[in-house]
Amino acid sequence: MAALRALGGLRGVAAQVLRPGAGVRLPIQPSRGVRQWQPDVEWAQQFGGAVMYPSKETAHWKPPPWNDVEPPKDTIVKNMTLNFGPQHPAAHGVLRLVMELSGEMVRKCDPHIGLLHRGTEKLIEYKTYLQALPYFDRLDYVSMMCNEQAYSLAVEKLLNIRPPPRAQWIRVLFGEITRLLNHIMAVTTHALDLGAMTPFFWLFEEREKMFEFYERVSGARMHAAYIRPGGVHQDLPLGLMDDIYQFSKNFSLRLDELEELLTNNRIWRNRTIDIGVVTAEEALNYGFSGVMLRGSGIQWDLRKTQPYDVYDQVEFDVPVGSRGDCYDRYLCRVEEMRQSLRIIAQCLNKMPPGEIKVDDAKVSPPKRAEMKTSMESLIHHFKLYTEGYQVPPGATYTAIEAPKGEFGVYLVSDGSSRPYRCKIKAPGFAHLASLDKMSKGHMLADVVAIIGTQDIVFGEVDR
């Protein structure tokens, strides 16, 4: 009955509200028989406090299943596995990375090497000491003559000979031209990977000029086989030193243009600063050398600490980084190019006259002019190039400061005309081993910047 009375009261209110001309205001006096009830404070307080009071019924309460049939399961989120390379344009050859990504963040980076393995160290054991030389051009095929220099120094140490001064100055001159070749490739391809195309085209024009110097002195643009045990293959042609001087004078302007484009570029700095940071302690533990070691703040350059050829007679500075990131290593490479120009200028000024091969008929072939008149010279030349020369038994580890780092040759002789063992220590191998450590926690795009700053060539890594 009470419900019916309440319903009747509501009908009366609705009739008054809907009457034409009436406002939306409720009547002040309710209809007869209707009581208006407002919830009092005591009644509202019983619903305050916690949502669920623990009681016998609610103590063992569990939320109902989501779909009333199956209970919810813990979903396992898996990281994505990505194959980077070996045909990736930013992989610099045949690098294959098996990467584990969480979103776009790198959790693991596993380099797979060996795709350019050619068995160089074993092949050298079946060749004479001179025939083994061209294999070294094909190791780090961006800095060719530096590899030849390391091997030649190792053989000379076993033979206990020293090339004449002019040959040593020519070696240093072309060693620094080779350093320019390598650093141009390293910096411009690094920039190209990060989106800056212009430096690549500007500086590769300069690189072609240096290939021309290679060609004029040896006949080959890349695999020169010019620096040989006992000296160099032939003397510098007329006019070459003048052209190298003109080139080195103009090249510093190209470097200024490169730095205008990159050094203070906001995008370049964002992509390289604090990317791939390696502390000095980590760099030593991983066995870094070259720019990778100096970028972390350790001043170690074999041209200064253990000079070979005539590096103790030239003046140059060793640039050192402070943070150990990609930006510091870029700055080190640019400054090394400027120091190489200093060394080239000193080589041109101090180049002495004289012989370019050691005066030892057991090692050096006779002159071409002699071979045209003397049968003995022709036989001597033939025997040297077919049988080779015997090297006294012994072992040596000889290292040079190649553009990428410490390039070492461990050479063992058993007294024959062929090496018993030739172990090649490539700098890029140790650098690639740290790729997992350097890229962990970075974005996928930063891995490209880290590969570029490591300056890896797979001829020397895979051997």
Swiss-Prot record:
Disulfide-bonded cysteines: none
A GO CC term attached to the entry: mitochondrial inner membrane
Membrane topology: Peripheral membrane protein
InterPro entries for this protein: NADH_Q_OxRdtase_suD, NADH_UbQ_OxRdtase_49kDa_CS, NDH1_su_D/H, NiFe-Hase_large
Binding-site list for [4Fe-4S] cluster: 326, 332, 347
Posttranslational mods: Dimethylation at Arg-118 by NDUFAF7 takes place after NDUFS2 assembles into the complex I, leading to stabilize the early intermediate complex.
Transit peptide: 1-33
Major enzyme class: translocase
Gene3D superfamilies: Cytochrome-c3 Hydrogenase, chain B
One GO MF term: quinone binding
Record's subcellular location: Mitochondrion inner membrane
Any single Pfam family the record assigns to this protein: Complex1_49kDa
UniProt KW keywords: 4Fe-4S, Acetylation, Electron transport, Iron, Iron-sulfur, Membrane, Metal-binding, Methylation, Mitochondrion, Mitochondrion inner membrane, NAD, Oxidoreductase, Respiratory chain, Transit peptide, Translocase, Transport, Ubiquinone
EC number(s) from the headed UniProt entry: 7.1.1.2
Record's keyword annotation contains Transmembrane: no
Cofactor note: Binds 1 [4Fe-4S] cluster.
Protein name per UniProt: NADH dehydrogenase [ubiquinone] iron-sulfur protein 2, mitochondrial
